Protein backbone atom coordinates (compact mmCIF):
# COMPACT_ATOMS: atom_id res chain seq x y z
CA UNK A 1 0.00 0.00 0.00
CA UNK A 2 1.41 3.40 -0.93
CA UNK A 3 2.25 5.80 1.87
CA UNK A 4 2.21 9.55 2.28
CA UNK A 5 5.96 10.00 1.91
CA UNK A 6 6.99 10.46 5.54
CA UNK A 7 10.58 9.29 5.23
CA UNK A 8 12.72 8.45 8.24
CA UNK A 9 16.33 7.25 8.45
CA UNK A 10 18.41 6.35 11.50
CA UNK A 11 22.02 7.18 12.40
CA UNK A 12 23.80 5.60 15.36
CA UNK A 13 26.70 7.58 16.86
CA UNK A 14 29.19 6.63 19.57
CA UNK A 15 32.93 6.77 18.83
CA UNK A 16 31.88 7.43 15.26
CA UNK A 17 28.58 7.38 13.37
CA UNK A 18 26.91 4.80 11.15
CA UNK A 19 23.73 5.06 9.13
CA UNK A 20 21.38 2.12 9.65
CA UNK A 21 21.21 -0.39 6.80
CA UNK A 22 17.47 0.26 6.52
CA UNK A 23 18.21 3.59 4.85
CA UNK A 24 15.26 5.87 4.18
CA UNK A 25 11.89 4.30 4.93
CA UNK A 26 8.39 5.69 4.44
CA UNK A 27 7.06 5.15 7.95
CA UNK A 28 3.50 5.85 6.83
CA UNK A 29 3.62 2.31 5.41
CA UNK A 30 3.63 -0.79 7.60
CA UNK A 31 6.79 -2.13 5.97
CA UNK A 32 8.66 1.15 6.39
CA UNK A 33 7.55 1.57 10.00
CA UNK A 34 8.63 -1.98 10.82
CA UNK A 35 12.02 -1.51 9.16
CA UNK A 36 12.81 1.60 11.21
CA UNK A 37 11.49 0.05 14.42
CA UNK A 38 13.72 -2.98 13.86
CA UNK A 39 16.73 -0.71 13.28
CA UNK A 40 15.99 1.13 16.55
CA UNK A 41 15.66 -2.13 18.48
CA UNK A 42 19.01 -3.29 17.06
CA UNK A 43 20.88 -0.33 18.57
CA UNK A 44 23.52 -1.19 21.15
CA UNK A 45 25.15 1.24 23.64
CA UNK A 46 28.84 1.85 23.05
CA UNK A 47 31.61 4.12 24.27
CA UNK A 48 31.85 7.83 23.60
CA UNK A 49 29.59 10.35 21.91
CA UNK A 50 30.55 11.68 18.48
CA UNK A 51 27.69 14.11 17.96
CA UNK A 52 29.67 15.85 15.23
CA UNK A 53 29.89 12.69 13.12
CA UNK A 54 26.27 11.82 13.86
CA UNK A 55 25.10 15.16 12.50
CA UNK A 56 27.37 14.90 9.46
CA UNK A 57 26.10 11.42 8.58
CA UNK A 58 22.48 12.45 9.06
CA UNK A 59 22.98 15.41 6.76
CA UNK A 60 24.62 13.23 4.09
CA UNK A 61 21.49 11.09 3.93
CA UNK A 62 19.58 14.00 2.41
CA UNK A 63 21.61 13.54 -0.77
CA UNK A 64 19.83 10.24 -1.45
CA UNK A 65 17.64 10.36 -4.54
CA UNK A 66 14.39 9.35 -2.82
CA UNK A 67 14.42 12.41 -0.54
CA UNK A 68 16.28 15.03 -2.59
CA UNK A 69 13.10 16.72 -3.79
CA UNK A 70 11.44 16.88 -0.36
CA UNK A 71 11.33 20.48 0.89
CA UNK A 72 10.85 19.81 4.60
CA UNK A 73 14.06 18.30 5.97
CA UNK A 74 14.53 17.72 9.69
CA UNK A 75 17.17 16.13 11.91
CA UNK A 76 16.47 15.02 15.48
CA UNK A 77 19.63 14.46 17.53
CA UNK A 78 19.02 12.31 20.61
CA UNK A 79 21.89 12.11 23.10
CA UNK A 80 22.31 10.86 26.66
CA UNK A 81 25.56 12.66 27.38
CA UNK A 82 28.00 15.38 26.41
CA UNK A 83 29.87 15.03 23.10
CA UNK A 84 33.31 13.51 23.61
CA UNK A 85 34.59 12.91 20.07
CA UNK A 86 34.66 14.89 16.84
CA UNK A 87 35.76 14.43 13.25
CA UNK A 88 39.11 15.79 12.08
CA UNK A 89 41.78 14.81 9.52
CA UNK A 90 45.06 12.94 9.86
CA UNK A 91 48.38 14.08 8.39
CA UNK A 92 47.35 12.64 5.02
CA UNK A 93 44.06 14.53 4.94
CA UNK A 94 41.91 11.50 5.65
CA UNK A 95 38.93 11.74 8.03
CA UNK A 96 39.68 10.47 11.52
CA UNK A 97 38.20 10.65 15.00
CA UNK A 98 39.55 13.24 17.42
CA UNK A 99 38.97 13.72 21.13
CA UNK A 100 39.69 11.69 24.25
CA UNK A 101 36.29 10.08 24.65
CA UNK A 102 35.75 11.16 28.24
CA UNK A 103 35.13 14.91 28.07
CA UNK A 104 33.94 17.71 25.82
CA UNK A 105 37.14 19.47 24.83
CA UNK A 106 37.27 22.81 23.01
CA UNK A 107 37.68 20.99 19.68
CA UNK A 108 34.73 18.69 20.36
CA UNK A 109 32.55 21.58 21.53
CA UNK A 110 33.26 23.69 18.46
CA UNK A 111 33.18 20.90 15.87
CA UNK A 112 29.64 19.82 16.74
CA UNK A 113 28.49 23.43 16.97
CA UNK A 114 29.99 24.30 13.56
CA UNK A 115 28.45 21.24 11.92
CA UNK A 116 25.06 22.09 13.41
CA UNK A 117 25.30 25.68 12.17
CA UNK A 118 26.19 24.49 8.67
CA UNK A 119 23.20 22.14 8.62
CA UNK A 120 20.79 24.84 9.77
CA UNK A 121 22.20 27.35 7.27
CA UNK A 122 21.48 24.86 4.47
CA UNK A 123 17.75 24.98 5.26
CA UNK A 124 17.42 21.84 7.37
CA UNK A 125 15.67 22.19 10.73
CA UNK A 126 17.62 20.68 13.61
CA UNK A 127 16.06 19.46 16.86
CA UNK A 128 17.78 17.84 19.82
CA UNK A 129 16.68 15.78 22.80
CA UNK A 130 18.74 15.54 25.97
CA UNK A 131 17.87 12.22 27.58
CA UNK A 132 18.62 11.79 31.27
CA UNK A 133 21.54 14.22 31.25
CA UNK A 134 20.10 17.73 31.14
CA UNK A 135 22.17 18.87 34.13
CA UNK A 136 25.43 17.31 32.99
CA UNK A 137 28.01 20.08 32.69
CA UNK A 138 29.91 21.12 29.59
CA UNK A 139 32.75 23.65 29.63
CA UNK A 140 32.20 26.57 27.29
CA UNK A 141 35.63 27.27 25.74
CA UNK A 142 34.55 30.79 24.83
CA UNK A 143 33.95 31.86 28.43
CA UNK A 144 35.61 29.19 30.55
CA UNK A 145 32.33 28.75 32.42
CA UNK A 146 30.44 25.49 32.77
CA UNK A 147 26.97 25.25 31.28
CA UNK A 148 24.43 22.46 31.38
CA UNK A 149 24.28 19.98 28.53
CA UNK A 150 20.75 21.19 27.86
CA UNK A 151 21.99 24.77 27.49
CA UNK A 152 24.79 23.65 25.17
CA UNK A 153 22.37 21.77 22.93
CA UNK A 154 19.73 24.51 23.01
CA UNK A 155 22.25 27.26 22.25
CA UNK A 156 24.90 25.73 20.00
CA UNK A 157 23.26 22.69 18.36
CA UNK A 158 19.49 23.11 18.03
CA UNK A 159 18.77 26.74 18.82
CA UNK A 160 15.60 26.94 20.92
CA UNK A 161 14.59 23.52 19.61
CA UNK A 162 15.96 21.30 22.38
CA UNK A 163 13.87 19.10 24.64
CA UNK A 164 14.74 17.40 27.92
CA UNK A 165 13.52 13.95 28.94
CA UNK A 166 14.32 11.82 31.97
CA UNK A 167 12.20 8.75 31.26
CA UNK A 168 10.17 7.03 28.55
CA UNK A 169 7.16 9.27 29.15
CA UNK A 170 9.27 12.39 28.80
CA UNK A 171 10.89 11.00 25.67
CA UNK A 172 7.47 10.33 24.14
CA UNK A 173 6.38 13.88 24.97
CA UNK A 174 9.50 15.29 23.34
CA UNK A 175 8.99 13.36 20.12
CA UNK A 176 5.29 14.29 20.10
CA UNK A 177 6.18 17.98 20.41
CA UNK A 178 8.77 17.73 17.63
CA UNK A 179 6.38 15.82 15.38
CA UNK A 180 3.74 18.48 15.93
CA UNK A 181 6.25 21.21 15.09
CA UNK A 182 7.31 19.45 11.89
CA UNK A 183 3.78 18.77 10.64
CA UNK A 184 2.54 22.27 11.48
CA UNK A 185 5.29 23.60 9.26
CA UNK A 186 3.72 21.78 6.33
CA UNK A 187 0.57 23.92 6.46
CA UNK A 188 1.94 26.51 4.04
CA UNK A 189 3.19 26.23 0.51
CA UNK A 190 3.28 27.70 -2.98
CA UNK A 191 0.59 27.10 -5.58
CA UNK A 192 1.46 27.42 -9.25
CA UNK A 193 -1.65 27.90 -11.34
CA UNK A 194 -2.42 28.86 -14.93
CA UNK A 195 -5.15 30.87 -16.61
CA UNK A 196 -8.12 28.93 -17.97
CA UNK A 197 -8.60 28.39 -21.70
CA UNK A 198 -9.76 31.52 -23.52
CA UNK A 199 -8.26 33.93 -20.97
CA UNK A 200 -5.09 35.87 -21.70
CA UNK A 201 -3.05 38.40 -19.76
CA UNK A 202 -2.68 41.64 -21.72
CA UNK A 203 -1.25 44.15 -19.27
CA UNK A 204 0.98 41.79 -17.34
CA UNK A 205 -0.89 42.51 -14.13
CA UNK A 206 -0.94 38.81 -13.29
CA UNK A 207 2.82 38.55 -13.09
CA UNK A 208 4.45 37.95 -9.73
CA UNK A 209 3.16 36.23 -6.62
CA UNK A 210 -0.38 36.44 -5.33
CA UNK A 211 -1.57 35.55 -1.85
CA UNK A 212 -4.19 32.83 -1.76
CA UNK A 213 -7.09 34.14 0.33
CA UNK A 214 -10.49 32.73 1.03
CA UNK A 215 -9.29 29.17 0.54
CA UNK A 216 -11.14 26.44 2.38
CA UNK A 217 -9.57 23.12 3.25
CA UNK A 218 -11.32 19.79 3.50
CA UNK A 219 -9.43 16.93 5.21
CA UNK A 220 -9.54 13.69 3.28
CA UNK A 221 -8.12 10.19 3.46
CA UNK A 222 -4.48 9.61 4.34
CA UNK A 223 -4.12 13.00 6.03
CA UNK A 224 -4.37 14.84 2.68
CA UNK A 225 -6.21 18.17 2.75
CA UNK A 226 -7.66 19.56 -0.48
CA UNK A 227 -7.92 23.35 -0.73
CA UNK A 228 -10.55 24.99 -2.90
CA UNK A 229 -10.43 28.62 -3.98
CA UNK A 230 -11.94 30.92 -6.59
CA UNK A 231 -9.74 32.76 -9.07
Regions picked out by a protein language model, each given a short descriptive name:
Residues 1-27, 73-79, 124-133:
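Von Willebrand factor
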Residues 61-65:
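Generic structural signal for alpha-helix termini and adjacent loop/cap motifs
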Residues 161-230:
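C-terminal "exit" segments of structured domains
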Residues 28-31, 35-41, 92-103, 206-231:
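Extracellular beta-sheet repeat scaffolds used for adhesion and glycan interaction
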Residues 42-49, 53-60, 70-74, 79-181:
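VWA/integrin I-like adhesion module and closely mimicked acidic/polar interface patches used
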Residues 2-3, 66, 182:
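Short regulatory alpha-helical segment in sensory/regulatory domains of signaling proteins that mediates
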Residues 23-33, 143, 153:
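Short, flexible, mixed-charge acidic loops at enzyme active sites
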